[in-house]
UniProtKB/Swiss-Prot annotation:
Its cofactor is Mg(2+); Mn(2+). NADPH binds at residues 7-10, 31-33, 111, 113, 184. Its EC number is 1.1.1.267. Keywords: Isoprene biosynthesis, Manganese, Metal-binding, NADP, Oxidoreductase. Belongs to the DXR family. This is 1-deoxy-D-xylulose 5-phosphate reductoisomerase. The gene is dxr. It catalyses: 2-C-methyl-D-erythritol 4-phosphate + NADP(+) = 1-deoxy-D-xylulose 5-phosphate + NADPH + H(+). It holds the Pfam family DXP_redisom_C. GO terms for molecular function: 1-deoxy-D-xylulose-5-phosphate reductoisomerase activity; manganese ion binding; NADPH binding. It comes from Campylobacter lari (strain RM2100 / D67 / ATCC BAA-1060). It comes from the Bacteria.
């Protein structure tokens, strides 16, 4: 298979499972972590590799090196593998998802932004979501037609215990302390702002075609999703917070090997479900509007991505993320997305607008 974003958290865990199950790796891609990429090259001996910056080419221990977005497209096209794991972070992963589907490859998707910004351009029946919530939903839905509502859970992120007034001056270091999951910087900030949960809701809509979706806080991250049925019953999916489970479910057809420990029900702490506070997590206010107009995902994602990286560089405060998103939405409204080129155009326009407005 092809693993894009191989040096990130999802990529590393995907390769762990690939090694365990003797899955051959035809191609790897990464951003800047050339040291880890070289270790992966030595272990998996891929036919091709792709890196972000051509300037780093001399550092890579490989002969067949592609570079940047154009290189990624060429590499995926040259690969014979029919299975692509896309674990690239952010909007940068969209092109790879599009080319993989165009070539008829099965897409194991950790890059949720592909669906957030361009869900209507994908055949989601050929996508396997690498996400604990969506893997849980798939298991719970299981061909049932009598679904009333879906729920995914949120931990509350790094600032669950913080008072609203204290969020104004939080540091990047504080924001990156996720209570339950070990993830990359971008998604950890998205978890703290609840933008991640907003994205997972629209992702679930594109994957399963159900608009009756909500999220609740379950701060232990032991319940990942719930499915409410018309007969009055509710099913819930429990597991430890470990991405290896949903990766294995996406990349292996059938397996009986355990990649994580089962929960010990008798040792499990008491669980509590809570409503998401819109005062503390104002971004989540956009849920119903986004489900009504999924094309808003292009504006929200571009704004969020731009603002999160500004925050990570200490160039703005944490609360500026939500403020900037609402500012962009006020300016652009519901975008007219008729073709995939419109997605790229709006993404560019939103970033340019915020670059001017948020100085």
């Amino acid at each position: 298979m092809i693993v894009l974003g191989s040096t990130g958290s999802i990529g590393v865990n995907t390769l762990f499972i690939a090694k365990e199950k003797n899955i051959s790796i035809e191609a790897l891609s990464c951003g800047k972590n050339i040291k880890l990429l070289n270790e992966q090259i030595a272990l998996f001996k891929p036919k091709f590799v792709c890196i972000q910056d051509e300037k780093d080419k001399h550092l890579v221990d490989h002969k067949n090196i592609f570079c940047a977005q154009d290189g990624l497209k060429k590499m995926i096209s040259e690969c014979k593998s029919k299975f692509v794991v896309n674990a690239i972070v952010g909007f940068a992963g969209l092109n790879s998802s599009l080319i993989a589907q165009k070539l008829g490859k099965t897409l194991a998707l950790a890059n949720k932004e592909s669906l957030v910004v361009a869900g209507k351009f994908f055949d989601t029946s050929k996508i396997k979501a690498i996400d604990s919530e969506h893997a849980a939903l798939k298991c719970l839905i299981d061909k049932r037609k009598d679904i009333k509502k879906l729920f995914i859970t949120a931990s509350g992120g790094a600032f669950y215990k913080y008072k609203i007034k204290d969020l104004k001056n939080v540091s990047v270091k504080e924001a990156l302390k996720h209570p339950n999951w070990s993830m990359g910087a971008k998604i950890t900030i998205d978890s703290a702002s609840m933008c991640n949960k907003l994205f997972e809701i629209i992702e679930a809509y594109h994957l399963y075609g159900i608009k009756q979706i909500d999220a609740v806080i379950e701060k232990k991250s032991l319940v990942h999703a719930l499915c409410e049925f018309k007969d009055g019953g509710i099913s819930a999916y429990f597991s430890h917070a470990n991405m290896r489970l949903s990766i294995a479910q996406a990349i292996l057809d059938e397996h009986d090997q355990s990649f994580i420990e089962n929960l010990d029900l008798l040792a499990m702490p008491s669980l509590k479900f809570e409503k998401i506070s819109l005062k503390k997590y104002p971004i989540f206010m956009l849920k119903d509007e986004l489900l009504k107009n999924p094309d808003l995902g292009v504006v929200i994602n571009a704004a969020n991505e731009y603002l999160v990286y500004k925050f990570l560089k200490n160039q703005m405060g944490f609360l500026d993320i939500s403020k900037g998103i609402f500012k962009a939405l006020d300016h652009f409204g519901v975008p007219k997305i008729n073709q995939i080129e419109d997605v790229f155009e709006y993404d560019k326009r939103v970033r340019l607008y915020l670059d001017k407005e948020m100085k």
